[in-house]
Amino acid sequence: MRRASDGAMTSRMSRDSAIKISRWLLCSAGLGALCVGGLKSLHAGERIDADRQKYAEQMEQTYSYRFGKGQPFLPSIAKIEGDTFIQPGAFPTAQYCQHCHEAAYHQWRQSVHANSFRTPFYTKNVGILQNSKGMEFSRHCEGCHNPIMLFSGQVTPRPALSDRDSDQDGVTCTVCHSIQKLQPAYGLGSYVMGVPAVMLDEQGKPIRGEVSFAEITAHVDRHKAAVMKDFYRTPEYCAACHKANIPETLNDYKWLRAIGLYDEWQRSSYAKQSPLPFYKKDYQTCQSCHMPREAALQRDVSTKNGTIVSHRWIAGNTAVPFLYGYDEQLKKTLEYLKADKLNVDLFALARTDGSGLIAPLGTKTFDIKPGDELQAMVVIQNKGVGHTLIPEQRDMYQAWTEFELTDATGKVLHASGRLNGEGYLDPDAHSFVTRLLDAKGNLLVKHEIWDRHTTATDATIQPGRSTLVRYGFRIPKDGTGPYTITAKVNYRHFDEAFTNFALGDKHPPYPVAEMAIRSRVLKIGENSPIAAEPKDNAEWMRWNNFGIALLDEAQYAEAKNAFSEVTKLRPDY
């Protein structure tokens, strides 16, 4: 199943290559005025603009202006220069860009951007919206998932012309690199698309459509001026799509926030815009984390010292590379998720008889007796993520804690947070998902955000903050020990119910990433202090994270006591 569509993708690439070759044959056979000779005899942009006008007039004949004649793209707020439809062919393909940027193309092809539309995880969900409310409502999604189809006027029940080739490519090079300006950071496609141009002429006027590679390499400065804007390197650029809301137009209820990664980043220490964070971090943007420099394994003219700016946009999506067999992308995604994003601290033990707190574990001497009833306090710190855990679509992305008590033979005596044989998570597990409810209080499990009226739970961890999870267990009465307690945080795209909805229930198990783990040994009798492990936080920080978690639980007296311990250890903090 994982590689089922690879053949189709290869066929598609071959067809695109043939189209590209045909275009250049036309240029060399007498229409070269558009491609060579300084482009003096006819400006290619004039032809593109004329074609656009004719195309738009034809598309307007059957287009459904459900939200008003002057608002063709609502509920998305994406706009395009000229305020009318544009033919899909006006966007040079990613294969065209591949000619000079093979490494970037290779990375992009495996990215979520390149697969933003075609995956069943997306199409099955948006299909519910189209069938229940109408195709026009899916424009809410397509401003970010399939902009070429949105701006070409094909997100309508009966388009006058149909060209769905770009469905396979999602967000292409010339989608991102044709955005001319940003609207206020509302998300939901808060950008203004330009008519794609890969080069400027001598007067600084955009040359629409494809030009010869010889022209580009002869005038690289004019190519860069056409396809790069300073704001492409800002968080606000990413916020245009990585922030969203549910307008009343979509839900027939009221405006609701959907995702807010940009807002969460602003509240983090990485942004340097908020007084609220507890820890100081170096300034980092979306691009710092998700577009680091990466070794260029293929030819690419933008290579510097063997690297290019990554066009993988590695984050948490393991499902797309697993589905399409992109092993390299999957490997890097799993490595990214495990790269010190979280800290799991088995911070304390509490006896259920109320005889006191043993904290922080590892720094105090304490006794354990057979039959003791204990509570482990697990503190989970979001230490390396610039937004929440879970980010974005919190209702179907799944992160949770797993806890185990094992004996000396490895036998599991107590467990929480396991997956059953069918891939479903223990319903009693501590999960970081958000549960969405419709107007009647029904749980929404297929990401039907247009039916959402309220949120039942939201257990996500804000950037730089912590949460506290408690686990009760009993030491066996006849046990001799030693015993081991282990806590870890797991993550997967997507929860089993949503994966089954998208793929059916015959799919292989989808990857689960172990983001952080910590174990401690409990002996019968005396347990002495032990040396900290390299991944452990300093003692003052362990108390601080415990206090932060208590503060967020509104346990103010207990939080104050924890922070008092911090000031004893760090008077300068």
Where in this protein do the model-derived segments appear?
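Primarily the internal scaffold of c-type cytochrome electron-transfer domains
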Residues: 45-88, 104-137, 153-463, 469-538, ...
